[in-house]
Amino acid sequence: MRISVNWLQSLVELNLSPEELGELLTIAGLEVEEIEDRRSWAAGVVLGRVISREKHPNADKLSVCVVDIGTEEPSTIVCGAANVRADILVPVATLGSYLPKVDLKIKPAKLRGVKSSGMICSLAELGLSKESEGIHIFPDLDLPSGSPVGPLLGLDDVILEISPTANRADALSMVGVAREVAALTGGKLSLPEIKAVSVSDQDLPISVTEPQACPTYVGTVIRGVKVGPSPDWLQQRLLAAGTRPINNVVDVTNYVLLEWGQPLHSFDQDKLQTLVGPEGFALGVRFAEEGEKLITLDDQERTLQPQNLLVTANDQPVAIAGVMGGAATEVDENTQNIVLETALFDGVTIRKSSKAINLRSESSTRYERGVNRCELEVALHRAIALMTELAGGTVVRQGKADQRQDRGEAIINLRLERLQQLLGKVNTPTGIGNITAEDVERILTDLGCGLTRQSDSDTPVWAVTVPSYRQRDIEREIDLIEEVARLYGYDHFCEQLPSNTIAGGLSPSYQAELALREACRGVGLTEVVHYSLVKPHGSEVMLANPLFAEYSALRTNLLDGLITAFANNQAQNNGALNAFEVGRVFWQNEGDIGEADHLAGICGGSQITEGTWPQGGKPQPMSWYDAKGLLEAIFQRLGATVTYSGDHQDPRLHPGRTALLSCNGTVLGRFGQLHPQLRREKGLIDEVYAFEITLTPLYQAMETQILGTPDFRPYSPYPAVARDLALYAPLELTVAELTQAMVKAGGDLLEQVELFDEYRGQSVPAGQRSLAFSLAYRVGDRTLTDADVEPLHNQIREALTKQFAVSLRS
């Protein structure tokens, strides 16, 4: 925001140079990015009166002017402007002066044979405009020739370009900065005196259908205004702030926005009436419908989105609320009656609306950060007073829809002991000490806070009442402590390190993620990273304002990206891509947006990566069990016990070669071979396997094994007793179900169950397969005998025959 020092001095007592003020504000947190000293722009430029103007004898487009600049003898100046004439007041750059905005030193010159002693200036040459059609002509002034023109053009000013942090919405106004300067320097505030305007006729119809998005809307009708240029003082203040003057009505709304931080907007009432027809109009606030259009004040036709909040007249859009008005109701030189809008719009709503159509304005910037809801009426009365003073007119009607929730007073308890503990020692005039209670009371009082002591001890506690204009960023005790430190001055604190330090560490979730990535890399997978933005296909979460159509939606899974990457690598003859990705996915959930962290992986090709020599020159494709073993190795490294069951829900995976992964009764995800149809569409090799799992339940299973205290168990020094078990099982019966039944029946003596053979073919009953398991029995205190093992082994055999339709072969 651009801060005029002259304007600031009218609001607060200020005895600092611009450089000192800039340093003070920067140290206090309102960073001053640039100091623009305009006083040098018109140094040596004075007010001159053109006594006579004659045509140049040797040039058709030049004039020879005699100009009174307050010296004993008038100056002869050759001028090329078409609008120069006798008896006008103009700015004259005298001999020896320097115009920094055009890098021109004024010297005696001879133009086409005529001597010229100075230059009559345009606003462009003085740095006040980019282009100019001629010299600047002052209105009749009661000033002698030779007077400096700097004060007349606002060039006796210094501009500070400040960049407030996002939490300091109050600093986006001149009054807010004046309050800050008063708190920092102790200067006296001189805010403009504002008288309340009473309106007896309160029958202007206002309908707000979205009270959360628009808690307050006030419309005020002012009739009989006379639109014209604003006075010089108002135009100069607007120009200093970087705002182009338009006319007195519009300039007043912009001026109040800059002064109080409250956006306003003026509608031409007669144009509103023409737009809606002969019947009376009612103002309203609602969200846009898909496909609605509105031409805004910048003459751009906007296609509106459902996120856009609109101001309507009889339900017809007339403005994008809080962002920009509509061209159809613009105030111009023919306007006689206006409707003045003053409103509170929700910051989040305005931010979404602004982004949806890629349009930002001074109003939207302030609404996004939050305006002071308690000073809305102050800004309204200020605008009405200025408008009736500068444009005439009479306030005749008003309407208000006010559903503001009463926040009440924000009271926060502040402990001096806590403040001193956090801030530490400071350098005082008498040496090193603590911030005193008197310092705290002085600083917070200067900030506009009210203080009530709760105790009179050496370390008192105060009940601090926060002013309304700071309630958005001062919400807790720590915020008050920060304000005390900021205004006391960071340069007064002692330079010492904290005495008590705490060892840092990684959060459990981050430890789990690191362990997961290490486990995946440990089994030979390469980590890849894809964009989280994808091309939409129908069910994705769409972006409101995407940069490109190809990246206009949030991904719903990771596997699609891995499949595409696998196909690209294969097409480039880079071989099979054995890779994994950890990332976040998004989905629609009953109007809300859900999100979760996922792990996905893909593998295929030959299972031997060292070459084809061991297979006699023939590659050996990866089998389903090879890929499953790779996934199990990851889970084993993570200490998670995962069970497998049949599944055919994912259309990308082979329905007969897909497993549902579960851990502690919670579904993790799926693993399987890619569907043949998908492989043909992508041109992939036959043996490609993939998995995708949700990480939250996996992390929970990892907490004890990986993130908690390790559980060490010694190896048994005694040998295991091995037994084989072969059976015929139906094809739909999974190995996981058989394994679970054996583990449950075997109890503590059964150490391991491993499938070592599967056969389908001749001598196997139709619809079945032959499975062979190796069972290992072991304990840690002795060697098991046949008498220990045989009863338990028979118990397992009986459990299988009772629970499943299997036929034992051994």
From Swiss-Prot:
Keyword Ligase listed: yes
Entry keyword Cytoplasm: yes
Subunit structure: Tetramer of two alpha and two beta subunits.
SUPFAM superfamilies according to UniProt: Anticodon-binding domain of PheRS, Class II aaRS and biotin synthetases, Nucleic acid-binding proteins, PheT/TilS domain, Putative DNA-binding domain
Lineage: Bacteria, Bacillati, Cyanobacteriota, Cyanophyceae, Synechococcales
Record's GO cellular component terms: phenylalanine-tRNA ligase complex
Listed name of the protein: Phenylalanine--tRNA ligase beta subunit
Subcellular location(s) per record: Cytoplasm
Binding locations of Mg(2+): D473, D479, E482, E483
Domain tRNA-binding: 39-150
Name of the gene encoding the protein in the UniProt record: pheT
Names of the cofactor(s): Mg(2+)
Organism from which the protein derives: Synechocystis sp. (strain ATCC 27184 / PCC 6803 / Kazusa)
Pfam families documented for this protein: B3_4 (PF03483), B5 (PF03484), FDX-ACB (PF03147), tRNA_bind (PF01588), tRNA_synthFbeta (PF17759)
PROSITE patterns recorded: B5 (PS51483), FDX_ACB (PS51447), TRBD (PS50886)
EC number: 6.1.1.20
MF terms (GO), sorted A to Z: ATP binding; magnesium ion binding; phenylalanine-tRNA ligase activity; tRNA binding
Cofactor note: Binds 2 magnesium ions per tetramer.
Keyword annotations: Aminoacyl-tRNA synthetase, ATP-binding, Cytoplasm, Ligase, Magnesium, Metal-binding, Nucleotide-binding, Protein biosynthesis, RNA-binding, tRNA-binding
Assigned protein family: Belongs to the phenylalanyl-tRNA synthetase beta subunit family. Type 1 subfamily.
InterPro entries: aa-tRNA-synth_II/BPL/LPL, B3/B4_tRNA-bd, DNA-bd_dom_put_sf, Fdx_antiC-bd, Fdx_antiC-bd_sf, NA-bd_OB-fold, Phe-tRNA-ligase_IIc_bsu, Phe-tRNA-ligase_IIc_bsu_bact
Domain (FDX-ACB) ranges: 716-809
